[in-house]
Curated annotation (Swiss-Prot):
Membrane topology value: Peripheral membrane protein
Species of origin: Tetronarce californica (Pacific electric ray)
Superkingdom of the source species: Eukaryota
Protein name (database record): Electromotor neuron-associated protein 1
Comp. bias regions, Basic and acidic residues: 562-572, 584-714
One of the GO biological process terms: dendrite development
Keywords per UniProt: Membrane, Repeat
Region Disordered: start-end pairs: 537-721
GO molecular function: actin binding; microtubule binding
Family stated for the protein in its record: To T.californica electromotor neuron-associated protein 2.
Length: 721
C-alpha cells in the first residue's frame, strides 16, 4: 500500500514520559495551517483478530455489526447501505506471502474507502491504522474485533497483539504529528473507535494524552445507525471469508522426513509474544519450558523435527504461556482422531500430518478440583486456558506432575535424566514453596484473579501488586553434569513469572553448591579446588612435624629412650648378684628397698684408740693391709670372669661388683663423665657398686679389726716393758 504524497507531512511532538506516549505540539507561529481534511470523504477500517473456533468467529461478526452502527455519520452524505453492497461485489483481496492466513480486503469508491484485515500480524495492523489517520477523509471508523487479553485488553493477533498503548504510539509518528498540528481546529478529523471493553481500552483517558486538541475521538459509542441490508450482506460475506484454521494449519507438518538429534547441551529461546518459551536439551533428553502466548506455537518449527519432547515445564497458569502448548496438545488429539477416521490408507497425504514428536511428562501445578468454566469468546482468560490444558492432557492420558520446594535449608534436586557415560540432569525448585500461604490460597481460589501486595512502593506512591498465579509460579534451576570431567557444567535459570525476592530466597539455599561459586567450571576443576585445601593442610602438618623433630634432635640425649632402657633394666638390678659361693653364704639377705636408698659417703668407724696420736702408725699399717687384700680379691674375681662367657656390654657394667683397680676406677669415672646426659643411670650404677662393695667388706673388716687389736696389744706390751 503506497502512501499518497499529500499525506506525508512532517510533524513535531513532545513525549510525556509518565504516560509513555506522545503529546502533540503545534507548529511555530509562523507556520501556516496548510492541511485540510475533506468533509465529504469517509474511511472504514475493520480488524478481525485471531479466530480459534466458530464461536469466536460469531462473536467477532456480531461486534463488527455493532461497531459500524455506532458510527456517527451523515447517511445522506454517505449512503452506507449502498457502499457496503458495493464492497461485497467489487472488493479486491490480497494475501501475504510472509504471514500465513493473513488476508486484506479493499474497496474504494468516491465517498468511502473500506479496508478489512483478516487474521493479520501486529505490523499489518499498525501500518493500516497509520494510513487511515493520514488519509484525507475527515470521517473515520476503526473497528477492532476478536479475542483480547484479560488484564490489558490487547487484541490478540496471530503474531503479537495490538494494545491501547500501540494505538497511542502511532500518534507519536513525526508525519502524523505534523499533519494533525497543521490542521485548522474547525477542520479536525473525526475518529470513532470501537474496541474491546477490557483493560486499558476500557480505562482509556484520552484527555490525558492531549489528543482531543488535534483530533476528535469517540470510544465505543452506542448504536446510532439503523439496521441495513447492505450491512447484513457485508457481515455475512466476512463470516464466509474468514477461515477457522485446523490444528494442522496452525502447526504445519515438516516438509521433509527425519528427526533432529541434539547431542550437545543447548538452549533455544523462542519469541514467545507476551510470554516466553525455550527448549533446553542435552544428549538424550530435552525439556520445553512454556509455550508462549501465540496459538501458532513459536517453538513448532524446531520441535516438529524432534522424535520426542521428553518433558514440558509450565511455570504458571496464564494466557501468556499456555496457548502455544495448548496448540501442540490440540494437534496431538487431532492426530488421534485423524488416524481413527482415515483407517489403514497409509499412502494418503494425511500421513504427513501424523509426523510430530511424542510427549513425555508434563510439570504443572494445578488444583485437583478444577471445574470447567463458561467460556468467554471475547476475552482470553488465564483460568480458561488452564481448563483447556487439563482437558487436552486428560484426552491424551497424561497426568500433570506438581513441582514444589520443600520447607528447609537445603533443596534436593529432581533427577530428570541420568545415563552412565553421558551425564546427569538435575532440576532445583526455587519456587513455589510447599505449604505456603500463597500456594494454599491459589489452590483454593485458582479461578479468581486476586492480587497480593508485594510491599514495594511504585513511583506513584501505590503498593505494587502481583497476581497469585505469578506469586506461585514455578522457578527452577537446571544443572547438567557431564560424565566427562573436563566438560563444562551447564546451569540454566528459568525464573518463570515468580517475584524476584522468591527467586533469590531459593538461590540462597543453594549457596553451598560448589558449581555455583564459579562463573565457568568443570568437574575436574571442582575436584582440584576441593583437594587443594586438604593438600595444603597436609603440607603444613608435615612441615610442623619436621620442625618439631629438628628441635628434639638438637636437645642433649636425656630423652625418653634412655629412661626406657633404665625401666627395662630395673628388674635386673633388683636381683642379688652372686660373686662367689662363700660370699653368698656369709652375706645376709638384703631387701630391694636398700638399693633405692640415696648414696651416702661412708666413714670408717672410729674407736677410742684410733683417736690417740700414738695410734696413727697402727692405722696406716691397717690401711695398707686392707688395700693388699682388696687387690688380691680383684685378681681372683678377674680370673673367674674371664673363664665365663661374656654377657652384653650394658650388663657387664651393671653386674660387675668387684673392687676396681685405681686405673680402672679413673677410666670408669671418665666414661661416666662422658655419659653425663644419663644421670639416672649413673646414680643407679653407683648405688649398685656401693652396695656390693659393702657386702664384700663386711667379712674382711672383721679380720682387719682382729689384726689391728693384736698389733695394738703388742705395742702396748712393748711400751709397758
Amino acid at each position: 500500500n503506497s502512501v499518497p504524497t499529500e499525506r506525508l507531512r512532517m510533524a513535531t511532538l513532545d513525549v510525556d514520559p509518565e504516560a509513555s506516549c506522545s503529546k502533540l505540539s503545534t507548529s511555530p507561529s509562523n507556520t501556516s495551517l496548510t492541511h485540510r481534511f475533506l468533509d465529504n470523504k469517509f474511511y472504514l477500517l475493520v480488524v478481525i483478530g485471531e479466530i480459534v473456533t466458530e464461536d469466536h468467529l460469531r462473536c467477532a461478526i456480531s461486534d463488527i455489526e455493532r461497531g459500524i452502527r455506532s458510527w456517527d455519520t451523515d447517511l445522506i452524505s454517505c449512503n452506507l447501505d449502498q457502499e457496503l453492497k458495493l464492497f461485497v461485489s467489487r472488493h479486491s483481496a490480497r494475501f501475504s506471502a510472509d504471514v500465513r492466513g493473513q488476508k486484506i480486503l479493499h474497496h474504494r469508491s468516491d465517498v468511502l474507502e473500506t479496508v478489512v484485515l483478516i487474521n493479520p500480524s501486529d505490523e499489518a495492523v499498525s501500518t493500516e491504522v497509520r494510513l487511515m489517520i493520514t488519509d484525507a477523509a475527515r470521517h473515520k471508523l476503526l473497528v477492532l474485533t476478536g479475542q483480547c487479553c484479560e488484564n490489558t485488553g490487547e487484541l490478540i493477533l496471530q503474531s503479537g497483539s495490538f494494545s491501547f498503548q500501540n494505538f497511542i504510539e502511532i500518534f507519536t509518528d513525526q508525519e502524523i504529528g505534523e499533519l494533525l498540528s497543521t490542521t485548522h481546529p474547525a477542520n479536525k478529523a473525526n475518529l470513532t473507535l470501537f474496541c474491546p471493553e477490557e483493560g486499558d481500552w476500557k480505562n482509556a483517558n484520552l484527555k490525558k494524552h492531549n489528543l482531543q486538541d488535534f483530533i476528535n475521538i469517540k470510544l465505543n459509542s452506542v448504536s446510532i445507525l439503523p439496521e441495513m441490508e447492505g450491512l447484513s450482506e457485508f457481515t455475512e460475506y466476512l463470516s464466509e471469508s474468514v477461515e477457522v484454521p485446523s490444528s494442522f494449519d496452525v502447526l504445519e507438518p515438516p516438509a521433509s522426513g527425519g528427526f533432529l538429534k541434539l547431542s550437545k547441551p543447548c538452549c533455544y529461546i523462542f519469541p514467545g509474544g507476551r510470554g516466553d518459551s525455550a527448549l533446553f536439551a542435552v544428549n538424550g533428553f530435552n525439556m520445553l519450558i512454556n509455550g508462549g502466548s501465540d496459538r501458532r506455537s513459536c517453538f513448532w518449527k524446531l520441535v516438529r523435527h524432534l522424535d520426542r519432547v521428553d518433558s514440558i515445564l509450565l511455570t504458571h497458569n496464564g494466557a501468556d504461556n499456555l496457548p502455544g502448548v495448548n496448540s501442540l496438545l490440540q494437534r496431538k488429539i487431532a492426530e488421534l482422531e485423524e488416524e481413527q477416521s482415515q483407517g489403514s490408507t497409509a499412502n494418503s497425504d494425511w500421513m504427513k500430518n501424523l509426523i510430530s514428536p511424542e510427549l513425555g511428562v508434563v510439570f504443572l501445578n494445578v488444583p485437583e478440583n478444577v471445574t470447567n468454566l463458561q467460556p468467554n469468546f471475547r476475552v482470553r482468560r488465564n483460568t480458561e486456558e488452564t481448563c483447556l490444558t487439563l482437558q487436552y492432557l486428560n484426552k491424551l492420558c497424561v497426568k500433570p506432575e506438581p513441582l514444589f520446594r520443600t520447607v528447609g535449608n537445603v533443596i534436593d534436586p529432581v533427577i530428570l535424566f541420568q545415563k552412565m557415560g553421558v551425564g546427569r540432569l538435575e532440576m532445583y525448585i526455587l519456587n513455589s514453596v510447599k505449604g505456603s500461604k500463597e500456594l494454599q490460597f491459589f489452590m483454593q481460589h485458582w479461578s479468581s484473579n486476586n492480587k497480593a501486595k508485594t510491599g514495594l512502593i511504585l513511583p506513584n506512591g501505590k503498593d505494587a501488586e502481583i497476581s497469585f498465579p505469578y506469586l506461585t509460579s514455578i522457578s527452577s534451576l537446571i544443572v547438567w553434569h557431564p560424565a566427562n570431567p573436563s566438560e563444562k557444567i551447564v546451569r540454566a535459570l528459568f525464573p518463570g513469572n515468580a517475584p524476584q525476592y522468591n527467586i533469590l530466597d531459593g538461590l540462597e539455599k543453594l549457596k553451598h553448591l560448589d558449581f555455583l561459586k564459579h562463573p565457568v567450571v568443570t568437574q575436574k576443576e571442582l575436584i582440584a579446588s576441593s583437594a587443594a585445601p586438604t593438600v595444603k593442610q597436609a603440607k603444613l602438618k608435615q612441615w610442623s612435624d619436621s620442625k618439631e623433630s629438628l628441635k628434639s634432635n638438637s636437645r642433649p640425649s636425656v630423652g625418653k629412650g634412655v629412661k626406657k632402657d633404665v625401666k627395662e633394666e630395673t628388674p635386673e638390678l633388683t636381683k642379688p648378684t652372686a660373686v662367689s659361693h662363700q660370699e653368698a653364704v656369709n652375706e645376709k639377705p638384703q631387701k630391694v628397698e636398700k638399693k633405692e636408698k640415696p648414696v651416702v659417703k661412708k666413714e670408717r668407724p672410729r674407736t677410742e684408740l684410733q683417736s690417740k696420736p700414738e695410734e696413727k702408725d697402727a692405722k696406716a699399717k691397717a690401711d695398707a693391709a686392707k688395700q693388699e687384700l682388696e687387690e688380691k680379691m680383684q685378681k681372683d674375681e678377674k680370673l673367674k670372669s674371664e673363664s665365663k662367657p661374656k654377657p652384653l656390654k650394658e650388663k657387664i657394667v651393671k653386674k660387675e661388683v668387684k673392687a676396681k683397680k685405681p686405673e680402672e676406677k679413673k677410666k670408669e669415672e671418665k666414661d661416666v663423665k662422658k655419659e653425663s646426659a644419663k644421670p639416672d643411670r649413673k646414680e643407679e650404677k653407683a648405688v649398685i657398686k656401693k652396695e656390693k662393695v659393702k657386702k664384700e667388706e663386711k667379712p674382711k673388716k672383721e679380720e682387719v679389726k682382729k689384726d689391728v687389736k693384736k698389733d695394738v696389744k703388742k705395742e702396748v706390751k712393748k711400751k709397758g716393758n
